[in-house]
């Protein structure tokens, strides 16, 4: 009875948006990358809310969005599904005060992060005929991290984007992570992973 009551409460709160559904999390998202089905980057849109600060001043903060749950990173590259920071989505980042050796090391790490992101999305979306899935895969396949900073759309917000801001994809007027078909793909993958690692509450 207690577990049923807790489950009902959880589902009610999730439906109201007061907590994230299982397999999803609320994350700070700063930019949206609009892409077409061929994977071309069409525009970069800032996603900031204006909030009141101290002494009557206002400031801009990233929007909070419900996206596929963030992975736990320890060492190595581990990408998030349909959102992440510039190292994973664009394969590039910026850091002040680096010498040449440090910069080269970071660039190599960024490339590995991007490759991890591309591999994750291919493993999840390969063979699917959904337009949004094709758009994301085409973007990741044709994007060249080495030329990211030369892209005029990225350059508009280079300082903010490349300093660790999180971003999502937009396709055909909507956020890709909100696409019902891709959300279903994530739900199934998350449920399968949970089944593989889950424990019984009674037996452990």
Question: Where are the regions a protein language model picked out?
Answer:
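Conserved phosphate-interacting/catalytic interface
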Residues: 1-198, 204
């Amino acid at each position: 009875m207690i577990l049923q009551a807790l489950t009902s409460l959880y589902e009610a709160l999730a439906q109201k948006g007061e907590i994230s559904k299982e397999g999803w999390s609320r994350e700070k998202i700063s930019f949206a990358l609009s892409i077409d089905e061929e994977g071309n980057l069409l525009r970069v849109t800032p996603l900031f809310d204006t909030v009141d600060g101290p002494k009557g001043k206002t400031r801009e903060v990233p929007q909070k969005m419900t996206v596929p749950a963030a992975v736990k990173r320890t060492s190595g590259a581990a990408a998030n599904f349909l959102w992440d920071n510039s190292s994973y989505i664009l394969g590039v980042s910026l850091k002040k005060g680096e010498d040449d050796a440090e910069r080269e090391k970071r660039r190599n790490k960024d490339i590995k992060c991007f490759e991890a992101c591309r591999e994750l999305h291919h493993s999840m979306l390969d063979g699917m005929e959904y337009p949004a899935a094709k758009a994301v895969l085409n973007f990741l396949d044709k994007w060249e991290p080495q030329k990211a900073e030369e892209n005029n759309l990225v350059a508009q917000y280079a300082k903010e984007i490349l300093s660790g801001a999180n971003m999502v994809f937009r396709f055909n007027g909507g956020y890709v992570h909100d696409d019902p078909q891709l959300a279903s793909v994530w739900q199934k993958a998350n449920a399968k992973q949970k089944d593989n690692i889950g424990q019984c509450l009674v037996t452990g």
